[in-house]
């Protein structure tokens, strides 16, 4: 299962590959995932342009020019690729977005535990409401020794469990 560093790396790579690119064609091969891919993607995504890609927790948010975003979580076996559009379809490829530069964004998952869904953003650069319950982002100034000290008061238990719980709030 990709952890935060992998999600950060994937987000940075997708930012370089997608920002400024326009979606020209959409194919949903297999909508059965942890959260089913909607057939509406076929009608709603062509013509949209990627304006930003960022990470929040272990999610990658690929923001579009219409106030929506593709929200991705890679689960245990999710993979994204941006490669030439003429590369043959792989067995576990679920979503295929052809870009205006001749490449394609491909979302694959062998176990179908991943998430790739279209969601509305409350504001440009924001996070989808689905992520409102997540804790403090560990790569920001808000997260540090002082924060951990404050939230650890009155708690007893294993350090790893505490950290996992704090990071999930």
Regions found by a protein language model. Give the residues of each.
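A cross-family signal for N-terminal binding/gating loops and helix N-caps
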Residues: 1-108, 112-114
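Phosphate/anion-contacting hairpin/loop surfaces
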Residues: 70-169
